[in-house]
Regions:
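Flexible, acidic/histidine-containing loops and adjacent segments that form or flank the divalent-metal
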Residues: 1
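An anion-binding catalytic pocket shared by soluble metabolic enzymes
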Residues: 4, 11-130
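Active-site-proximal loop/helix of nucleotide/amide-processing enzymes and allied scaffolds
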Residues: 130-143
């Protein structure tokens, strides 16, 4: 299932991420494979997402993030370049779901691209924020 089909709002967000990645590349802010982009997608999730089979085994986050149970994120793929993400975001990143145990995530779309590893810092950094503050969260870090 292509997760962007029939979800114009989600597609617009992912295309915005691609545009930002293009700017990061052009400005030289993300060296080679450096830099992470993660966007919270939970508000764009549809009922069809919950039963979607995982494309990966559960992957350990490195800490427990109970406030993010069941949340969805788009994350740039590890070893993926910003310029390539700008051209084809779903081939250079993936949509992940935080598992019910809050200590693992699984890749659900569109391909099994291993995401960058900033989830523990994102989760710990926002643990004190009310969920309403998290309606759209974008994180970019340079290495």
């Amino acid at each position: 299932m292509e997760i962007l089909s029939n979800n114009a709002a989600l597609k617009a967000v992912i295309m915005d991420v691609a545009e930002v990645a293009g700017h990061i590349w052009v400005k030289g802010w993300g060296e080679r494979n450096g830099g992470n982009i993660t966007v919270r997608l939970t508000e764009f999730a549809t009922p069809e997402w919950a039963p979607m089979p995982a494309l990966s085994d559960p992957i350990a986050i490195g800490c427990e993030l109970p406030h993010l149970r069941g949340h969805y994120f788009y994350a740039k793929g590890t070893q993926k370049r910003m310029r390539d993400l700008a051209r084809d975001p779903m081939a250079n990143g993936s949509v992940i779901r935080i598992c019910d145990d809050c200590a693992h995530y699984e890749i659900i779309a569109d391909s099994a691209v291993m995401p960058t590893s900033e989830l523990p810092s994102i989760g710990l950094g926002i643990s004190q924020l009310p969920i309403s503050t998290l309606s759209l969260m974008i994180v970019f870090t340079c290495l």
